[in-house]
Regions:
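Glycan-recognition and catalytic cores of secretory/periplasmic carbohydrate-active enzymes
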Residues: 41-421
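Bacterial Sec-dependent N-terminal signal peptides
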Residues: 1-45
Length: 421
């Protein structure tokens, strides 16, 4: 325990020092970048225009989700109806997070009040142990609420959720097991310890739990998971496998495959985006440059791939067989844009800001942003859940809206020369 605590303390001191340096170095970089912008009015207007549309769309969706005194969780809209999910669904925290982002973008306390209601129906999730996505579910809801309003009790929920997620850590392979091997749509696959690249997105919860509690356990689990994933999930070109299955006895790899991509050896688009975002986040909390370098290499794969469209809204899989006659995935584009704005603040590489801006422009166009009053109230159209499972194909998805609003917030801060965190 003493050794682990010292390891954490040293890393955490480094993190705090890095954070201070970033605050000033990044501010200088961002101010220089903001001064160099040649079309500030256009950039400001695209943010304001999206906020105006989002107020109408997300307001309509929130109204629909609060009828009859019952708070429901909207996930998508298809066949003329809103689909709602239970609190234990992996996407259950995104709409609450979207409402928090609406508060952040507008300053209107009515959004904060709504966000609290939609957040607190997720209270039981802090004890959920049968899948890994509690990081998404709780940090995007309670985490944003704590950050923006410092709501009493929210910090405790985050720490308890990390305790629950830590029960899924498998010490022999050194990973957080994503799915139970015998439960859900993957239960027939014969896996022992499946880990999906999406799991990188749950690590922020663990880093924050250590920050809040002082317990190094969560930090160390997150680092071990990130390191093993870096070693096992990526090919030589920095594309990634969706699923790696580990042997719980030996810790070795039993197999590499896909669940939501086109083929075991293909590059499922959203998986690449999760990797870029996840490793950039790991860099933010650890200061370990390996993570940022890795995120940049995965980003390079995406941007250089021959099948990346000019508008930077990827096809659902970079190796899908019928490109260009394949569905695009707007959710992937939104995740990439948000991650790229953060990467820009650490690297000063204008490429990331330029590409993020291009994505925001694309998603703000009529090709991808819904007309006011349509799309069931969702902001963006044309996302893909899982084509192999026939699930949520070419529909709006709540996490596409979430990451798009996050990208707008980050864009605004970058262009104002402000720190993102």
């Amino acid at each position: 325990m003493r050794k682990a605590s010292l390891v954490y303390q040293n890393n955490y001191v480094n993190y705090l020092l890095m954070k201070i340096l970033f605050k000033y170095a990044t501010a200088a970089l961002l101010l220089a970048g903001a001064a160099a912008c040649s079309q500030p009015s256009k950039r400001a207007s695209i943010i304001d225009e999206n906020i105006a549309v989002a107020e109408k769309q997300i307001g309509m969706l929130a109204d629909s989700s609060e009828t009859g005194g019952v708070i429901r969780i909207p996930s998508t809209w298809k066949n003329g109806r809103i689909d709602y999910v239970p609190v234990d669904d992996w996407v259950s925290g995104f709409f609450a997070g979207t409402l928090w982002y609406m508060y952040e973008l507008t300053g209107d306390e009515a959004w904060a009040a709504r966000a609290r209601k939609h957040t607190e129906i997720l209270d039981s999730v802090q004890y959920l142990q049968w899948h890994h996505d509690v990081g998404f579910m709780i940090y995007d809801s309670y985490g944003n609420g704590l950050r923006l309003k410092n709501v009493p009790g929210y910090e405790d929920v985050i720490v308890q959720t990390a305790k629950s997620l830590a029960t899924r850590f498998r010490p022999v392979p050194g990973v957080i097991q994503s799915w139970d091997a015998d439960r859900g749509w993957q239960g027939e696959r014969g896996w022992q310890c499946p880990v999906i690249i999406d799991n990188m997105m749950n690590l922020e919860l663990m880093f924050k739990a250590t920050e809040f509690s002082g317990d190094s356990t969560y930090y160390n689990i997150a680092v071990k998971h990130a390191d093993r994933t870096m070693k096992e999930h990526f090919r030589d070109d920095y594309s990634c496998y969706h699923v790696v299955d580990y042997d719980l006895t030996t810790g070795g790899v039993r197999g590499r495959c896909t669940a939501q991509g086109y083929a075991d050896d293909s590059a499922w688009a959203r998986g690449q985006a999760w990797a870029v975002y996840g490793y950039t986040t790991c860099y933010r909390y650890t200061g370990d440059k390996r993570y940022l370098d890795h995120a940049r290499k995965v980003a390079g794969f995406m941007l250089d791939d021959k099948n990346m469209p000019a508008d930077l809204v990827p096809y659902w899989d970079y190796d899908a067989p019928n490109i260009p006659n394949e569905p695009r995935d707007v959710s992937t584009a939104a995740i990439i844009a948000s991650a790229f704005y953060e990467m820009y603040t650490y690297t000063g590489d204008e490429l990331y800001k330029q590409k993020a801006d291009r994505i925001v422009e694309s998603l703000s166009s009529p090709a991808y942003r819904a007309p006011v009053g349509g799309n069931g109230g969702f902001l963006l159209m044309h996302s893909v859940g899982s084509i192999p499972h026939g699930s949520n194909i070419d529909v709006p998805l709540n996490y596409a809206d979430y990451y798009f609003l996050e990208a707008l917030i980050r864009k605004a801060r970058v262009e104002a020369g402000e720190s993102l965190f």
